[in-house]
From Swiss-Prot:
Keywords: Lipid transport, Secreted, Signal, Transport. This is Apolipoprotein C-I, acidic form. It is found in: Secreted. Residues 1-24 form the signal peptide. Apolipoprotein C-I is present in acidic (APOC1A) and basic (APOC1B) forms in P.paniscus, P.abelii and P.troglodytes and perhaps also in baboons and macaques. The two genes for ApoC-I arose through a duplication process that occurred after the divergence of New World monkeys from the human lineage. In human, the acidic form has become a pseudogene sometime between the divergence of bonobos and chimpanzees from the human lineage and the appearance of the Denisovans. Pseudogenization resulted when the codon for the penultimate amino acid in the signal sequence was changed to a stop codon. It holds the Pfam family ApoC-I. PANTHER family: APOLIPOPROTEIN C-I (PTHR16565), APOLIPOPROTEIN C-I, ACIDIC FORM (PTHR16565:SF3). It comes from Cercocebus atys (Sooty mangabey). The lineage of its organism: Eukaryota, Metazoa, Chordata, Craniata, Vertebrata. The keyword Transcription regulation does not apply. The keyword Amino-acid biosynthesis does not apply.
Length: 81
């Protein structure tokens, strides 16, 4: 759920950011070019975001925490049984 919300915030920030000065006024000759450019920009930003998440220590720490918690609960259930 948090990943979904994070991605939603990234997409909204990209959309609300607007055009950069180098882009200027888009050419209306082919509206699909604008859509294709937006898709490529969005793809690059999402890939960068996913790489940032996968290279961080957060997933490893979370996995370790879940493993440790599961092990503790399992031990408590063995003792009580």
């Amino acid at each position: 759920m948090r990943l979904f919300l994070s991605l939603l915030v990234v997409v909204l920030s990209i959309v609300l950011e607007g055009p950069t000065p180098a882009q200027g006024v888009p050419d209306v000759s082919n509206p699909f070019d604008v859509l294709e450019e937006f898709g490529k920009t969005l793809e690059d930003n999402v890939r960068e975001f996913i790489n940032l998440i996968t290279q961080s220590e957060l997933p490893a720490k979370t996995r370790d925490w879940f493993s440790e918690t599961f092990r503790k609960v399992k031990e408590k259930l063995k003792i009580n049984s």
